[in-house]
Amino acid sequence: YDMAAVETLGWNVLTNRPKEAAYRAPGAPMAIYAVESVVDELSQILNLDPIDVRLKNAARKGRKSSYGPTFDDVGLIETLEAAKAHPHYQAPLGPNQGRGLSAGFWFNFGGNTCVSLNVNTDGTISVIEGNPDIGGSRASISLMAAEELGVPYEKIRTIIADTASLGHNDITDGSRVTFSVGLATIKAAQDAIQKMCGRAAQIWGIDADAVTWEDGAAVPAGENAGKFPPLSLAEIAAVSFETGGPIAGHFEVNADGAGVSFGVHLCDAEVDPETGATKILRYTVFQDAGRAVHPSYVEGQMQGGAAQGIGWALNEEYIYGKDGRLQNSGFLDYRIPVASDLPRIDTVILEIPNPGHPYG
């Protein structure tokens, strides 16, 4: 939120019981729960619509965040406005039913990445990157490579190599892979395009500066370049051994400029006043995705995050015995939500481009 002054005090507490491992949303939902609970209390005291209170206090472009950086393009206002205009927010509630609202935030991350892109003689493309795919990133990387090269998506194969096969790659974390690996892939594709334009110039007998790349093919550029039919990527690749050997692009980057990401969730729940049994009736997620490279995977991430949050709130708990041993170490006893526990989780993707990335 847009706060004139803020002081944050935190503690690091050493605990020996839970093990340390990779897990989605480290720490963020806990802090957001505290903040959003206070905003809801203020809305009730002031008798104001909770979305209106958030809109009045929402972070905006050019304002400094509580953790240091200055916000660039911020999607919080757009997600709040989308939630307020959605039929879910206006739908009536029945007895023992309530509606919850929360805004959320993640700062995102760039980091160090190396990507190699090989143009194969059959016209296919191999993209080699070093970050495991845990959320559909291979599809997004392939789409960006196809877009930059101007070839069909089916021609791209993204390979997760072991990290000894490339330069340094930071780990898959912090929502960094589509941003940072995507940026390196785009630049590696541009490197390969420059080399393919050079090969086309060699075939035509003209200067490389007189060749440009359009729609997956090299074309002569300018009045003095001569008139030659376009040479497609597949045609250039097929004769690459005769024009200088294999064609590959490479790029390494320490990516900065990762944009912040905001979301708003609406949840309708029904509580049995006698037993306390809780049922989730309706759930809608509004998310600023920057640019949804692969919308189906973006929706899956939104739905998976919502299901995980519901599990935290209603079901999931570590239970320890007096001896400090975990009593529910398996999914038989550690109760995560299953499909029968959840309604359809609706998604609304908003695209507020990040100026720090070629594709937003």
Question: What are the functions of these language-model segments?
Answer:
Residues 1-106, 122, 144-360:
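C-terminal catalytic domains of large/alpha subunits in multi-subunit enzymes
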Residues 111-113, 135, 263-265:
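Short, small/polar residue-rich loop motifs at catalytic or cofactor-binding pockets
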Residues 139:
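P-loop NTPase nucleotide-binding module
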